[in-house]
Amino acid sequence: MLLPMLVSIPFFGGFLCLLFNQKNAKISYYLALTSMALVFILSLILLFNTINVIVSSISNSSWSFEYIVPWIEKFGISFHLAVDRLSILMLNLTSILGLVSVFCSWKKVQKNIGLFYFGLLWTLGSIIGIFISVDLFLFFCFWELSVLPTYFLMIMWGYKDNDRKFYYNNIFSANKFFIYSQISGLVLLLSTLVLVYTHYIYDHILTFDYDVLKHTSMNIVLESCIMLGFFLAFAIKIPIVPFHSWLPDFHCYSPVIGVVDISGILLKTSIYALMRFNIPLFPHSTEIFSSIIMFFGIITIFYGAIVSLFQNNIKRFIAYVSISHMGFILIAIYSINQVAYQGAIIQLISYSLSTAALFLLSGHVFKSISTFDIDKMGGLWSKLRWIPGFLLIFSIINLGVPGTGNFVGEFMIFMGCFNSHLMIVILSIFSLILLALCSLMFVQKICFGPINNRYDFLCDLNVMTICDFLIFVFLLVLILIIGLYPNIIIDVSYSPLCSIRNIFSNFI
């Protein structure tokens, strides 16, 4: 019963927060905090129990925990939840960043507090559902459900720039996100239905169960078409070039607290879905199209890095750098290499933590000087306590300096791709020079240089509370632990990632 509890706690907690929306703001906060604390505890229980479970084989059907009850039996749909070590890692990442989101929201949300936590918890609940669903219809339901609360968080609590035209505001950006998400959902639904129908034609069994569908027999043309449909649905939400235009706008005008979930967790569901569904369901077509998709990964890396050089909005800059780093992970996924797979997971987790920290810091900068415009900043190192120092630290971490999880992830990706994709590795390494230049310019413009006279009143202003300070220290410690002792993730993720790699052993 751990899995149903894990997915239901955020939804139930969000509903309770909504009930107390107009009564007591503190009650809503403590309900949200309690809900995420329970999710975190359950995630840790799953992790420790999974480590102690001896799996007899590394087949793709080996789940550490599983829960299944019939739902719509006529169409072969069941409420099928299951986790292996890969999904448990993602659950722990979700619970950690969920707790960070709730902690950081204390006294920062001023209106409709209960409704805010309702949207936040339902977003987190949907993400948890995505990570533990192995019935494709149930997965699709959670995939679509994650869009609505995120959309309303953007509409009601997003940043409103009254000096810009209507198409540069939170409502337009939210609508753009919604449209892209609906296109992604539509393509995913159509591709799923074609896969289910194909399985029914060949095996005369109507089912949405992942464990059954991965054995579907089909010709290579049909498999390629369905695989590309799944890939397109997930690529829109990663996002990769050319499906990326919604992300910078969304980050720019979304609430800082909401960005932690969107950038830190929600976008990573697509990476997880590629590894969980795209590769095991369509191994032959994955191998055929791997080089083309890796080429898109290279384009994404360079495009994100180059465009970020010309950004003057701190949140838009972080968004483009995030897009660039997603290119590295995409290359790792389609390299068909065990070491690169593990590097992708380490990079995914570490980068989620460091990006969440940078977005939170951008909120602190805005609270201090009431602007996200980098060109209007400068000399903040002597004006603000702690914030410039943390900006420098997490920007350097994003460069992938040794001793951090980001470095280990990138190094393993390059090492895994080196033998079979040497040119890809060389181009990727050159892109790191651009990313380093971006990060250094980012820190220099904000923290150093001439002091803007309009910020003289900020001298020694301390906008960072003890709680905020401890959160940044906590995120920093996690990244350093992963960097100094990556076996924490490597050992846990080895079995499921080895299963994915072994799918190709019969025909590569």
From Swiss-Prot:
The chain crosses the membrane at residues 1-21, 36-56, 63-83, 86-106, 113-133, 136-156, 177-197, 220-240, 255-275, 288-308, 317-337, 343-363, 389-409, 423-443, 470-490. One of its GO terms (cellular component) is plasma membrane. It is found in: Cell membrane. It catalyses: a quinone + NADH + 5 H(+)(in) = a quinol + NAD(+) + 4 H(+)(out). Keywords: Cell membrane, Membrane, NAD, Quinone, Translocase, Transmembrane, Transmembrane helix. It is an enzyme of class 7 (translocase). Belongs to the complex I subunit 4 family. NDH-1 shuttles electrons from NADH, via FMN and iron-sulfur (Fe-S) centers, to quinones in the respiratory chain. Couples the redox reaction to proton translocation (for every two electrons transferred, four hydrogen ions are translocated across the cytoplasmic membrane), and thus conserves the redox energy in a proton gradient. Composed of 13 different subunits. Subunits NuoA, H, J, K, L, M, N constitute the membrane sector of the complex. This is NADH-quinone oxidoreductase subunit M.
